[in-house]
């Protein structure tokens, strides 16, 4: 997922706001309570960063409350809950003539355990300090 964050920011920066709308769709198991998920909101943050704005200014969580056409710069969210899906996130950049989708699908929850263990191993070899998942991904 951390790689996806970086890809979303880069893609958002590269594709013009006037030419591409951004939609974030996420699916999780039926037991998940928050909607949208923290991961989906983080993806929105990275998309907004790529456009040099804030998610608070651009997020649309519910299109059912007022009837209006889409405004430039909006970042829309859609949420699905069902079954035992560990997590699926799609960030779509939708233009007039094409669509670019960036997708991450967790087949099961073990991928999150692996990420935590990889991070712990990485940190065990480092001096005390502040590190992010980007340090793990890009500075091995």
Where would I find each of the regions flagged by the language model?
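C-terminal substrate-binding/catalytic lobe of Rossmann-fold NAD(P)-dependent oxidoreductases
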Residues: 19-140
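A contiguous active-site-proximal alpha/beta segment in oxidoreductase catalytic domains
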Residues: 1-21
